[in-house]
UniProtKB/Swiss-Prot annotation:
Signal sequence interval, chain numbering: none
Gene Ontology MF terms: membrane insertase activity
Record has Iron as a keyword: no
HAMAP family reported in the protein's UniProt record: YidC_type1
Entry function: Required for the insertion and/or proper folding and/or complex formation of integral membrane proteins into the membrane. Involved in integration of membrane proteins that insert both dependently and independently of the Sec translocase complex, as well as at least some lipoproteins. Aids folding of multispanning membrane proteins.
Keyword vocabulary terms for this entry: Cell membrane, Chaperone, Membrane, Protein transport, Transmembrane, Transmembrane helix, Transport
Topology class, membrane: Multi-pass membrane protein
Quaternary structure annotation from Swiss-Prot or TrEMBL: Interacts with the Sec translocase complex via SecD. Specifically interacts with transmembrane segments of nascent integral membrane proteins during membrane integration.
Gene of this entry: yidC
Protein name: Membrane protein insertase YidC
Gene Ontology CC terms, in alphabetical order: plasma membrane
Organism, scientific name: Bacteroides fragilis (strain YCH46)
InterPro entries xrefs: Membr_insert_YidC, Membr_insert_YidC_N, YidC/ALB3/OXA1/COX18, YidC/Oxa/ALB_C, YidC_ALB_C, YidC_periplasmic_sf
Transmembrane segments: 3-23, 363-383, 439-459, 478-498, 520-540, 545-565
Family to which this protein belongs: Belongs to the OXA1/ALB3/YidC family. Type 1 subfamily.
Length: 618
């Protein structure tokens, strides 16, 4: 570093020190600045003190308001939690004096996976609160201790008393041999104590639906929050995702539904201003859904008219639910909790499948045998349509050599219309309809689908064993893997595997019967047809073994039927019969689909010629 550089740095340092000394604030400025910051701190302290005072005042006001509201039932604000049980031969209900609510529901005749009676909910699984109103605000029943009075084995009154002459009663009564429990709210001596202008009570109801069955995935798929519009149809929230809905219409009932069991809350005077929510629970949590509902219903604070409601804690059994409407003018239609398919298929299941199933079950047969017999009966019913479909395919097959000749005659793409017209003419000459097998197939489809929809909802199959399957209502884990396979799970269902194999065989025989030829598009179609059963293996592996068993034997019967029909059909004789029809003058007259198709083809040909002539003139 040279002398000039050192001198420059020293001068810069002197300038910086001098500037700092000259620019420093005076003592008066320092004092003024200190007073400024002190004033800010004082203001902040005052604001914090005011905020704390305001919050304390609000909290105190809230407590005073709640205390003023609760002062009507001051004696009920303190107590000790106690439980009361009522029961009949089907269900056991435990009531909690804290809130006067239903604490648990146990079904005596249905066992869980632990071989103990099914408990729909217990303790903190569920909650229920009623908001009544006086001049000071809301009275929440969850904050009060009720007194159990007038108790019998099947009924009890939970009483919330202001004094000996003024109280609100929750009256619970179990009907004999029934899963239905009457629930009545009645005010006595509450004139002037409750807001006379408020003729409603607000209700909050929630329940975490337990996983009762072995298969979380399938049970979760059939568990949803369902509700019925007054005098109208039934609706539900999504079963596959979190869902919420505000319902402006009046409702008859709200149901928290599992696959085979439901908790239903019914209001004779209807629910209104309803909001329903459903949230998914994680697999392995022991629960499948978290349901909640907020609604209002009629309440007479004078006590002249009671609030009539009901609870149903029981199975989703079609005839059990249907019987609840017996003698009622306005039907609840709780049997809609049992899903039986689309309207036509539901009608078939309602009037035919269920009655035949019950008749077969009445013989004391194994449920596997009942399903086998039911499937055979269905196959017998649809056999005429099956035979007609087969014969239509057989006729098409024996005429295929003649169709091949027409294909060779018109190899060019521009001759496709002529080729199609000649093919249809050939079919018409032999009295064969290319659509002849479609209508019979469509007619038998609803019948076959009816049983497919019925089996998963049939609680009768629950915990019924057959062969290696210990429960026909859930999957049969013939092989269990120590890991999870995407789209398949951690197990392999043997009935599902058998169903897949028989479907591949059925596809093979069907493709042979149709004899689709070697066209590229037909080859691709063949692969698609073979791929479908393999896809079903992944889709249906979690489905009930009873359903896969039905699908397996149904397809197996179809394969056997196809083989028998193929071996008993003399195709040479069939061709001879078709040749005889060709010589019949009556067959020369084209009718039906063939005639309409030929007319359309001629019309298209004429339009094509007209367009060509116009272009030539130009």
């Amino acid at each position: 570093m040279d002398k000039n550089t050192i001198t420059g740095l020293v001068l810069i340092g002197i300038l910086l020190v001098g500037f700092s000394f000259l620019s420093r604030p005076s003592e008066e400025q320092i004092a003024a600045q200190k007073r400024y910051y002190d004033s800010i701190a004082v203001v902040q302290q005052q604001e914090e003190a005011l905020r704390a005072k305001t919050e304390a005042a609000l909290a105190n006001e809230k407590e005073e308001t709640a205390a003023d509201s609760a002062s009507l039932f001051f004696n009920a604000t303190k107590g000790k939690e106690a439980f009361t049980t009522i029961q009949n031969n089907l269900v056991e209900i435990t009531l909690d004096n804290k809130g006067g609510r239903v604490y648990s529901a146990l079904l005596k005749n249905y066992m869980g996976q632990d071989k103990k009676p099914v408990v729909l909910f217990n303790g903190s699984d569920a909650s229920m609160n009623f908001n009544f109103y006086n001049k000071k605000g809301a009275l929440q029943t969850k904050d009060f201790y009720f007194e159990a009075v007038n108790k019998t084995d099947s009924s009890v009154t939970m009483r919330l008393a202001a004094d000996s002459a003024s109280y609100i009663d929750f009256i619970y009564t179990l009907k004999p041999d029934n899963y239905l429990m009457s629930f009545v709210i009645k005010a006595t001596g509450m004139d002037g104590k409750l807001a006379a202008s408020t003729n409603y009570v607000d209700i909050s109801w929630s329940q975490r639906a337990r996983q009762i069955e072995k298969g979380y995935t399938y049970e979760n798929r059939l568990a949803d929050l369902t509700y019925k519009y007054t005098g109208d149809d039934v609706d539900n929230l999504s079963a596959s995702k979190d869902d919420e809905k505000s319902v402006s219409e009046r409702l008859d009932w709200i149901a928290f539904k599992n696959q085979f069991f439901s908790s239903v809350f019914i209001a004779e005077q209807d629910f209104e201003k309803t909001t329903v929510k459903s949230k998914m629970e994680k697999q392995g949590s022991g629960y499948i859904k978290d349901y909640s509902a907020e609604m209002s219903t009629f309440f007479d604070p004078t006590g002249k008219q009671p609030t009539d409601m009901y609870f149903y804690f029981g199975p989703n059994h079609y005839k059990t639910l249907t019987a609840l409407d017996k003698g009622r003018e306005e039907k609840w239609e709780l049997n809609n909790l049992v899903y039986l398919g689309w309207p036509l298929i539901r009608w078939i299941n309602k009037w035919i499948t269920i009655n035949v199933f019950d008749w077969l079950s009445g013989w004391g047969l194994s449920m596997g045998i009942v399903l086998l017999l039911l499937t055979i009966m269905v196959k017998i019913v649809v056999f005429p349509a099956t035979w007609k479909t087969y014969m239509s395919s057989a006729k098409m097959r024996v005429l295929k050599p003649k169709i091949d000749e027409i294909n060779k005659k018109y190899p060019k793409q521009e001759d496709a219309m002529k080729k199609q017209q000649e093919v249809m003419g050939l079919y018409s000459q032999y009295g064969v309809s290319p659509m002849g097998g479609c209508l019979p197939m469509l007619l038998q489809f609803p019948i076959l689908m009816a049983l497919f929809m019925f089996v998963p909802s049939a609680i009768e199959l629950r915990q019924q064993s057959f062969l290696w399957a210990d429960d026909l209502s859930t999957y049969d884990a013939f092989i269990t893997f120590p890991f999870h396979i995407p789209f398949l799970g951690n197990h392999l269902s043997l009935f599902c595997l058998l169903m897949t194999v028989t479907n591949i065989l059925n596809t093979k025989y069907t493709m042979q019967q149709q004899d689709t030829g070697a066209q590229p598009q037909m080859a691709a179609m063949k692969w698609m047809m073979y791929l479908m059963p393999i896809m079903f293996l992944f889709v249906l592996n979690d489905y009930p073994s009873g359903l896969n068993y039905y699908y397996f034997i149904s397809t197996l019967i179809s394969v056997v039927t196809m083989i028998i029909l193929r071996r008993t059909t003399d195709e040479n004789k069939l061709l001879t019969e078709l040749e005889a029809k060709k010589k019949d003058p009556k067959q020369m007259k084209k009718t039906g689909f063939a005639a309409r198709l030929e007319a359309m083809q001629k019309q298209q040909e004429q339009l094509a010629k007209e367009r060509a002539n116009k272009q030539n003139k130009k």
